[in-house]
């Protein structure tokens, strides 16, 4: 049976909650905050490939790490439509 592992990081000056969901060396980040280096180090040390980033909203404290993460992992970023 496959197991999902959910890890919580509290990141940045706003103490943003970031969640990493892991399964079979693949992972998804939810609201990666502004600490790309910390997240990249964790992913590397745990032999995880980042397959997607999900954003609950576009505030600065939730999206600061996106450029570095997308550049390194070439993964899609998902966010709701603007109305």
Residues covered by each model-derived region:
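Conserved beta-strand hairpin/beta-sheet module of binuclear metal-dependent hydrolase folds
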Residues: 1-46
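Active-site HxH/HxHxD metal-binding segment of metal-dependent hydrolases
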Residues: 35-83
